[in-house]
Design a protein with these regions (language model features):
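N-terminal leader/auxiliary helical segments
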Residues: 1-223
């Protein structure tokens, strides 16, 4: 559910507040692209990729109206117990993406149930509009450079291979999103339809803490 502007904002905040070596991150650009990667083949953010893969597969999520990715399963499969030197920045970024989706999607499911709103098209539209507004409250400053290292790490992504042509499409899509988001940046807090500023603040803080603790633990093992 979070768009790439929200994923980028969490990644940028983490990189502002922590040193990359303490997080185990070696290439910032590759890590940033990893934060977009699970959406690449779903087709929503980058419609012109070579082929499509289902959200449930790329995000390790069961089919549901608001799916919640299993980020711990991804960690256990591709990070835990591995030689840190063999865990790429793309993999770390992809894990961060799943944390973000799981945090916001899970919180949204709970919130909707608590206030007694029934799932449906009207609820979906209200929810999507709120997330679109929330994403525009962030001003984004980092771009993903298209480098041989990025192409190589994507080709070696352990969950499924990423074609070079699709990496290029993804980088271009990220640039377009960043430019558009900054052009339409909201300096003042927006008025939401379904969710609330407190919902986004609390959920964002929880996501940040999971990201920080997980990557600090990885970075300590990598030292």
């Amino acid at each position: 559910m979070p768009s790439w502007n929200i994923h980028a904002a969490h990644a940028e905040r983490l990189l502002r507040e922590e040193k990359t070596d303490t997080l185990g991150i070696r290439d910032i650009g590759n890590f940033l692209f990893g934060n977009f990667l699970p959406d690449l083949y779903v087709g929503w953010m980058v419609p012109d990729v070579s082929h499509k893969l289902p959200y449930g597969m790329t995000h390790m999520a069961e089919t549901a109206t608001i799916p919640v990715p299993q980020y711990q399963k991804f960690w256990d499969l591709y990070i835990e117990g591995k030689n840190p030197s063999e865990v790429t920045d793309i993999v770390l970024g992809a894990w961060a993406h799943l944390v973000c989706d799981a945090g916001y999607n899970g919180a949204t499911r709970r919130y909707i149930a608590e206030i007694g709103v029934k799932p449906g098209d009207r609820t979906r539209i209200r929810k999507q509009k709120d997330f679109e507004l929330y994403g525009r409250t962030f001003f984004l400053g980092r771009r993903v450079p298209l480098t041989p290292s990025l192409i190589d790490e994507c080709a070696a992504f352990p969950q499924y291979p990423i074609l070079a042509e699709d990496v290029e499409c993804g980088v271009k899509a990220a640039d377009v999103l960043l430019d558009g988001n900054n052009e339409r940046h909201l300096a003042d807090a927006p008025t939401y339809s379904l969710l609330t500023p407190e919902f986004f603040r609390m959920t964002g803080d929880r996501v940040d803490e999971i990201l920080r603790q997980g990557l600090l633990r990885f970075g300590k093992a990598a030292c």
